[in-house]
């Protein structure tokens, strides 16, 4: 059990999970998931003998779910040495973590970590035997990448760890990096020197990468997996279309039909959430800052309003933006009694959770894990799900296996690219022909039959018979 295990700075533990006896249960669900993840299984078949990842030390910071377990075992099957942690304190499925630990992979993750635990787990996953670091990273949200970069900066100027920060996760990150710096003053420079690159899973992490690149601070090459069509137009859209409702239902058992649902943001995630809630019979209001996305929402029949107008009308609120302060405390003050507030963006700063917790006279009653009822002094209350973190993973089990196979097939291909080729420091995307191949690998499973171009047809539109079929700038 986790509470009996040591937590020294650089641990020699083979793993740290909630309960290793859950491994058999986890293995049964992994076996089921494999049948729903044809892309990953095809990569095992294609590359299992050649092992293109032999010699790779892959660190993963990505939700430790059943689906991720299939990804991890694919990377291992292709020859990699793997260490793993979760990228969210609530998203780990403990039976999945146990099964992976039992298979011999070093995993440091359990559901309900605190933030000190979280960064400790990230550090352990970055620490390979012999004091080595990874040479490739699978990241989701950019926290592993950030730990290396902040640690690297601190080795140049320790004062960066004393700068005033307000977010608790940054406070805890700086605290553990101070301990690392005291013990090893060149660790992160050595790690960065051996890094061949990182592949980033989600919108938030990609924003961080581009920002570091623009500032000239990016230390190693990066693949933007999020913007592969077979990731963003499937995982973000179709995955959220199913997993949002799953999270809300498991947390609250609420009837969605007839309710007013406010979806903040109409990007790929917001589109999936809006259509999901409407399919249940809700009246959906959308908030947007982008005129193009706002027009798309309006043309789909959604009412586009401001949060100032929506906060008194909604029964359920969902943030999907990847930005900060989307639902503020002054919005929550005006909400209906027992309004449900949740987030499906990567971080917990879309909702002003800290301001809610420190609101004068507020009373918090925990209903069950990841469901808290906050009573305001005027008597009205709101239900906050997953403490403002990802509701689909905090209150349910995330996206279904099939759609995650798309994303994780992209991740595996990106890892092969980064490990086997030398890239200049920049942010890259997978080429179009690989995007199409990822889609192709999933067609047979759902009974799709492709039409094949004739040579004359291909020549007429200026493409190869076997693709790629669209220009890089094509919008799907």
Swiss-Prot record:
Binds 1 NAD(+) per subunit. PROSITE patterns: ADOHCYASE_1, ADOHCYASE_2. Its EC number is 3.13.2.1. The keyword Hydrolase applies. Keywords: Cytoplasm, Hydrolase, NAD, One-carbon metabolism. GO terms for biological process: L-homocysteine biosynthetic process; one-carbon metabolic process; S-adenosylmethionine cycle. Pathway: Amino-acid biosynthesis; L-homocysteine biosynthesis; L-homocysteine from S-adenosyl-L-homocysteine: step 1/1. Substrate binds at residues 65, 140, 201, 231, 235. NAD(+) binds at residues 202-204, 236, 265-270, 288, 323, 344-346, 392. Its cofactor is NAD(+). InterPro entries: Adenosylhomocyst_ase-like_sf (IPR042172), Adenosylhomocysteinase-like (IPR000043), Ado_hCys_hydrolase_NAD-bd (IPR015878), NAD(P)-bd_dom_sf (IPR036291), S-Ado-L-homoCys_hydrolase_CS (IPR020082). One of its GO terms (molecular function) is adenosylhomocysteinase activity. Its main location: cytoplasm. GO terms for cellular component: cytosol. It catalyses: S-adenosyl-L-homocysteine + H2O = L-homocysteine + adenosine. May play a key role in the regulation of the intracellular concentration of adenosylhomocysteine. Belongs to the adenosylhomocysteinase family. HAMAP family: AdoHcyase. This is Adenosylhomocysteinase.
């Amino acid at each position: 059990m986790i509470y009996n295990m040591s937590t020294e700075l650089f641990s020699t533990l083979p793993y740290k999970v909630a309960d290793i006896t859950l491994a058999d249960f986890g293995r049964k669900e992994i076996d089921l998931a494999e049948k729903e993840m044809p892309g990953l299984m095809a990569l095992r078949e294609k590359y299992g003998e050649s092992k293109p990842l032999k010699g790779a030390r892959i660190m993963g910071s990505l939700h430790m779910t059943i689906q991720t377990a299939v990804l991890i075992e694919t990377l291992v099957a292709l020859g990699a040495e793997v260490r793993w942690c979760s990228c969210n304190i609530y998203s780990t499925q403990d039976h999945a973590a146990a099964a992976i630990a039992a298979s011999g992979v070093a995993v440091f993750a359990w559901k309900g970590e605190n933030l000190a635990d979280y960064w400790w787990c990230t550090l352990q996953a970055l620490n390979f035997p012999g004091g080595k670091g990874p040479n490739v990273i699978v990241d989701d949200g950019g926290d592993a990448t950030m730990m290396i970069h902040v640690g690297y900066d601190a080795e140049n100027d320790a004062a960066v760890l004393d700068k005033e920060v307000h977010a608790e996760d940054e406070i805890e990150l700086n605290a553990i990096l101070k301990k690392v710096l005291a013990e090893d003053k060149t660790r992160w420079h050595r790690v960065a020197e051996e890094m061949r690159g990182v592949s980033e899973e989600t919108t938030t992490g990609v924003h961080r990468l581009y920002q570091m690149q623009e500032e000239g601070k990016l230390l190693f090459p990066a693949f933007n997996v999020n913007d592969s069509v077979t990731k963003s137009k499937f995982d973000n859209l179709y995955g959220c279309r199913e997993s949002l409702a799953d999270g809300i239902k498991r947390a609250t058992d609420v009837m969605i039909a007839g309710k007013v649902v406010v979806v903040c943001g109409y990007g790929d995630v917001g589109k999936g959430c809006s259509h999901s809630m409407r399919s249940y019979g809700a009246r959906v209001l959308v908030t947007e800052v982008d005129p193009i996305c706002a027009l798309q929402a309006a043309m789909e029949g959604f009412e586009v309003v401001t949060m100032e107008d929506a906060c008194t009308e909604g029964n359920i609120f969902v943030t999907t933006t990847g930005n900060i302060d989307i639902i503020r405390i002054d919005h929550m003050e005006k909400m209906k009694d027992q309004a449900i507030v949740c987030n499906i963006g990567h971080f917990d700063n879309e909702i002003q959770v800290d301001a809610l917790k420190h609101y004068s006279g507020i009373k918090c009653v925990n209903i069950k894990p990841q469901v808290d009822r906050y009573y305001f002094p005027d008597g009205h209350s709101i239900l906050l799900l997953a403490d403002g973190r990802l509701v689909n993973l905090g209150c349910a089990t995330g996206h279904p296996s099939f759609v995650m196979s798309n994303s994780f097939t992209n991740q595996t291909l990106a890892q092969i690219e980064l490990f086997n080729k030398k890239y200049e420091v920049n942010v890259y995307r997978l080429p179009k022909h690989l995007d199409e191949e990822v889609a192709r690998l999933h067609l047979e499973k759902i009974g799709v039959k492709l039409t094949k171009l004739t040579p004359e047809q291909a020549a007429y539109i200026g493409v190869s018979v076997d693709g790629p079929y669209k220009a890089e700038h094509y919008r799907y």
